[in-house]
């Protein structure tokens, strides 16, 4: 979804030019071993966007050549350096593109802060000390990092890659907000269970808590062991009368959440709480839809959760995140 927003930004700046998306990583199974691709590219299936994919304008034989070269590069083992190897492969099938995304092997940059976490970084002590260091630095500075301008106007044929930064403050998503909201209109709910939940969240001061662990646990360590959820829940209690908490988890985290009430600053015996854990597989995206229908959100460092908060149309919403430059109303 963030990538599609970048497409909209490029198209806005170059309205008369042909602009395409590419979904190559979803067709390479090995990529999923490094960065989870979940159910692959789903925007056309869910939102019926009919996005212009560059694959549609390349002859099948040329596309096979392109994919063979990209797979042989094993970019996913080279700091996810797809911009370099993708543009090289496009060049070799006669499509020269200027790489404006960069060279991750040269700069050490990547699309994720950590693609492969060394064993010593997985220890509780290391992660906790690292969290304390980051929290101290965060409290010392409220500066918003400078992110690349996503509204690029050019006469060159370019490969932009993915910045995935529209979820951050100062990146300009408001410039394409009408187009984004028009694109991401969820289909009507179909299951009786989802419909029942939608009715519940509309009739109370509903608070969605996105307790995503799974593949994002190393990035959200501080949320669970640094008191983030407790601070966010405490603030919600101060500002919202009779809140009801709806906890959304990935399938493998539900039981963990049910046995760790203290992590969330909740009392499962006395607080009004409901777990949402039935949307799985091809229906996983329904959780985003249901979370967006809640009055308020408490999210982690996850674009899935962030979209639920951003798409929430409640004018008095409170949206909480653990990073001071996330585009939410509050940070803890």
Identify the residue ranges that each predicted region occupies:
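Secretory-pathway luminal glycosyltransferase catalytic domains
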Residues: 33-240
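N-terminal pre-catalytic "stem/leader" segment of glycosyltransferase-like enzymes
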Residues: 1-30
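Structural alpha-beta junctions
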Residues: 9-18, 46-54, 233-243, 264-274, ...
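Donor-binding and catalytic core of enzymes assembling or modifying cell-surface/extracellular glycoconjugates
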Residues: 1, 240-327
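A general structural detector for well-ordered alpha-helical segments in enzyme core domains, enriched
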Residues: 6, 229-232, 260
């Amino acid at each position: 979804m963030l990538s599609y927003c970048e497409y909209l930004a490029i198209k806005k700046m170059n309205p008369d030019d042909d602009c395409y998306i590419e979904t190559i990583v979803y067709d390479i199974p090995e990529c999923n071993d490094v960065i989870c691709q979940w159910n692959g590219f789903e925007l056309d299936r869910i939102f019926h966007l009919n996005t212009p994919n560059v694959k549609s304008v390349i002859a099948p034989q040329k596309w096979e050549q392109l994919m063979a070269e990209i797979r042989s590069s094993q970019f996913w083992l080279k700091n996810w350096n797809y911009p370099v190897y993708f543009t090289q492969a496009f060049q070799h099938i006669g499509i020269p593109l200027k790489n404006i995304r960069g060279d991750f092997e040269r700069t050490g940059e990547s699309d994720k802060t950590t693609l492969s976490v060394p064993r010593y970084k997985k220890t509780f002590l290391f992660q906790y000390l690292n969290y304390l260091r980051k929290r101290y630095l965060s409290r010392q500075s409220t500066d918003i990092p400078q992110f690349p301008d996503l509204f690029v106007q050019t006469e060159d044929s370019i490969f932009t890659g993915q910045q995935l930064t529209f979820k951050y403050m100062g990146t300009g998503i408001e410039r394409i907000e009408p187009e984004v909201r028009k694109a991401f209109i969820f289909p009507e709910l179909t299951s009786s269970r989802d419909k029942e939940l939608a009715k519940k969240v509309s009739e109370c001061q509903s608070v969605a808590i996105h307790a995503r662990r799974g593949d994002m646990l190393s990035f959200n360590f501080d949320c669970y062991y640094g008191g983030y959820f407790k601070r966010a829940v405490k603030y919600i209690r101060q500002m919202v009368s009779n809140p009801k908490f709806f906890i959304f988890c990935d399938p493998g985290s539900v039981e963990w959440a049910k046995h760790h009430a203290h992590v969330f600053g909740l009392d499962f015996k006395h607080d009004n709480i409901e777990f949402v854990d039935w949307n799985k597989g091809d229906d996983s995206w329904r959780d985003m839809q249901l979370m967006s229908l809640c009055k308020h959100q408490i999210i982690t460092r996850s674009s899935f959760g962030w979209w639920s908060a951003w798409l929430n149309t409640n004018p008095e919403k409170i949206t909480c995140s653990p990073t001071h430059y996330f585009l939410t109303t509050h940070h803890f």
